[in-house]
Amino acid sequence: MATPSSIPAEPKRDVVNRIHRVTRGNRSLWYQMTVLQQPERARACGSGSKANSDRRPVDPPPVVELRIIEGPSVEEGKDITFDYNANFFLYASLEHARPLARGRVNTPAAGNPPILTGVPASGMAYLDRPTEAGYFIFPDLSVRHEGLYILTFSLFETTKEERDFDLEPADGDLPPGVDYRMEIKTDPFSVYSAKKFPGLMESTQLSKTVADQGCPVRIRRDVRMRKRESKPGAGNSNSGGNGFERREEDFGRRRTITPASEDPHSIRNRSHSNSSEQRTPYTDASRRPSMVDAYPPPPPPPPSYEPAPSASRHLDFGDSSAAQYPTPRQYAHQPGLQITPGPPSASYAPTSQSPYSKTDAPYGYVNRNIPPSCPSPAPSLKHELYDRRQSTSTYVPPSPSVYSTEGHHRRDSRPSYPPTPVAAPRPRPMHSQTSLPALKIDQLVSPVSPLPPIEPQTGPAPELPPINVGGKRKHESVFAQSTRPLHNGQRQVDPHYGRSHRGYSPDHDQGWYSRADGQISSVQFNRYYDE
């Protein structure tokens, strides 16, 4: 078995190679070939059924330059690359960078040469940049197996003029006019597996220059390098570890990585609401949110009218235990008593700071001001209904506050009457003194007989004409054609003309046409026609 000391070191290869030959016409020609762009890396494309379509080109693509100089020496000669009448092509072959030691048992896989796929031959392109010369470009070279390889380029020439032939044919196996000239090798490059491939770098400036002149070279504007973290024991994964561990590592790299739960950025922020923690049992689900909840509660009533502890809210809409309408505040019966509205309470927010602006009465109802609630004196009595129309002043308006001036409107809960537009009354001045008659408590509150139900404020609106509900007209009301089958050349009768006239109207000055609703109408024409 070969030891590392017995393996010869790989000599450094020259990137420039020259040959000299003399033609039949006694011309002294020098061939100089240079590898301008060396291959660095490649990804193995495999040897399966999809390897031919799954190309993984060598990166960067190899570029070889050729110059032809005529003269006694390279330094004293003349560059005739563009003037020399011949065709050149370069053939690429793949070789192992290090010689493989032969084992005791010769296996078929050990004797097989490495497989190079793609387009291994390239013709010479005459380019002006980076310098005027001939260039061979290999943008489609792929390697099937991973390892360390080198590329060998062999130059062949097809001579066109007889004076440029060799004095003696060099190789008898080649057809006449085709001669092998020289070869050059690249530096070693690595071919990685799909798991270990580091990625592709941005295209080189030489590749961009060649592509700008029309050569088929793929250009990458960004870097596509993988960022891999070093794992313990990754260096000896090929020599050590069993196949199960390698498969597990491969599966871990391919699967989608889910962020850990301890990552603070991956956890969704929880709601700051504590409504679920302070939820009380048997909540009032029938209550609707209203604008009244946005204001502070009104001041408590006088001590003589202190209600039961059950009345703790200003308004309870939809609550079966609460009164349908609040009972007006009761005052002593004093004839000729004048009540002056006082200034707004300090605990109320000013009108300009209210979050709601004053609006007119919606849906055409009369604007009504709801006074502060005053509960019933006795909880056992039924809450009576009373009429609170604007035209009848049967109670004293409350002190001007946000409850009376901000426009809390109430809608009648009688859906049997359609809404009727009513002009909103003029707002009363806040600081004007109004003289009102005394309240009659006996008429407002009766412990025995309930008040009559609320009546509509205006008479019923006149009935509107019926509105046609959207629908389609019948077919026979639009189209006059018959639906019966036609036989023996029969045709539908054209409704635009009479039955006795086929294609013509009875009068030359009059035409008939069918409207969209199925009606037949006529139109008068000018009297310019031949008799």
From Swiss-Prot:
GO CC annotation: cytoplasm; nucleus
Stated role: Component of the velvet transcription factor complex that controls sexual/asexual developmental ratio in response to light, promoting sexual development in the darkness while stimulating asexual sporulation under illumination. The velvet complex hat acts as a global regulator for secondary metabolite gene expression. Controls the expression of the cycotoxins fumonisins and fusarins gene cluster. Involved in cell wall integrity, cell surface hydrophobicity, hyphal polarity and conidiation pattern. Required for pathogenicity against maize seedlings.
Biased composition (Low complexity): 391-405
Family: Belongs to the velvet family. VeA subfamily.
Effect of inactivating the gene: Suppresses aerial hyphal growth,reduced colony surface hydrophobicity on solid media, and increases the ratio of macroconidia to microconidia. Impairs production of fumonisins and fusarins, and reduces pathogenicity against maize seedlings.
Organism name: Gibberella moniliformis (strain M3125 / FGSC 7600) (Maize ear and stalk rot fungus)
Stretches the record annotates as PEST: 430-461
Short sequence motif Nuclear localization signal: positions: 40-45
GO biological process: sporulation resulting in formation of a cellular spore
Domain notes from UniProt: The C-terminal PEST domain is a region rich in proline, glutamic acid, serine and threonine residues that is required for the light-dependent regulation of development and secondary metabolism.
Disordered as annotated region, ranges: 206-435, 447-517
Protein name (record): Developmental and secondary metabolism regulator VE1
Pro residues bias: start-end ranges: 295-306, 416-427
Composition bias, Polar residues: 348-357, 479-491
Family annotation (InterPro entries): Velvet (IPR021740), Velvet_dom (IPR037525), Velvet_dom_sf (IPR038491)
Keywords associated with the record: Cytoplasm, Nucleus, Sporulation, Transcription, Transcription regulation
PANTHER family attached to this UniProt entry: DEVELOPMENTAL AND SECONDARY METABOLISM REGULATOR VEA (PTHR33572:SF14), SPORE DEVELOPMENT REGULATOR VOSA (PTHR33572)
Chain ranges of the Velvet domain: 26-220
Gene3D superfamilies: Velvet domain (2.60.40.3960)
Subunit structure comment from the entry: Component of the heterotrimeric velvet complex composed of LAE1, VE1 and VELB; VE1 acting as a bridging protein between LAE1 and VELB. Interacts with VELB and VELC.
Biased composition (Basic and acidic residues): 244-253, 381-390
Subcellular localization: Nucleus; Cytoplasm
